[in-house]
């Protein structure tokens, strides 16, 4: 109880301070009267917000409400492990993802949907507005299995139809679907990077790639890409041919998408992990990008410090940092 009280006090202080949520000190723009604005939260919440499930998600709900988002995209939206343990929850006893309808209502979202769900790490989208599930993407064995699934959703806000694509690509250094005896060789040949390229190609071809006018439609593709971008090479100093750049080079060169964080923070490097790696991204189509007035990686009272749980190896509150976007609806 004391821990929760202190958390609530910190959230209140954050609100009074203007939600200063990054080392840059930039804050979300206050909505004007002329045009409505929406906020979008994107976060890999690590095993269905494992760090707060023993607290009935009270800190998580309080934190989400403090940003008053209109749309949320959550990666790893399934409860996988028992509270404070690295012990799997028995099948059928997982609160999430089926409990998202109840949980989302606690922070003001009456609508939710799930992307393609083929393993323990699906994505979920929640919203103040009705959600149309266009496609649940899992790929196929003959072409490309999308390891953690993906989703294409449409939400109409203030008369504007918005396309949302959620994803979470393969995390390992070796390729998906190979035997344990082949993993070392696959790792040596950057198999994981090439597999993530197959996944992102499949996802884009089956979403924005099907649009007749993607430049002028509103598209947002976001999630945990498990890949680094050549736009951040001022930090990494890799060879430009490095296979770790394959995923984002494809997005930047073969689609109309624009890297939102890079666009709003030219010359800066904003890690989205506890280390020095930006692997969580939000991409917008040109028409939507022109209306993004704020974007940042959140570092606030709750997510500012990522703490390793020594007993399990998991992180608290997550091993990733959230992204926050604000978009003007005009």
Segments predicted by a language model, with ranges:
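N-terminal, active-site-proximal structural segment of metallo-dependent hydrolase catalytic domains
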Residues: 2-7, 15-106, 117-120, 319, ...
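Active-site-proximal beta-strand elements of phosphoester/diester hydrolases
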Residues: 37-49, 135-137, 161-171, 178, ...
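Metal-dependent phosphoester-hydrolase catalytic domains
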Residues: 136, 209-220, 226-330
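Extracytoplasmic/secreted proteins, especially bacterial periplasmic and envelope-associated proteins
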Residues: 55, 59-63, 95-102, 121, ...
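Active-site-proximal segments of metal-dependent phosphoesterases and phosphodiesterases across multiple
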Residues: 169-202, 226-245
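Structured beta-strand-rich core segments of catalytic domains in phosphoester-bond hydrolases
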Residues: 75-172
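Active-site environment of divalent metal-dependent phosphoester hydrolases
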Residues: 49-50, 79-83, 118-122, 172-175, ...
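Active-site beta-strand/loop signature of hydrolases that rely on acidic residues for catalysis
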Residues: 38-45, 63-91, 126, 153, ...
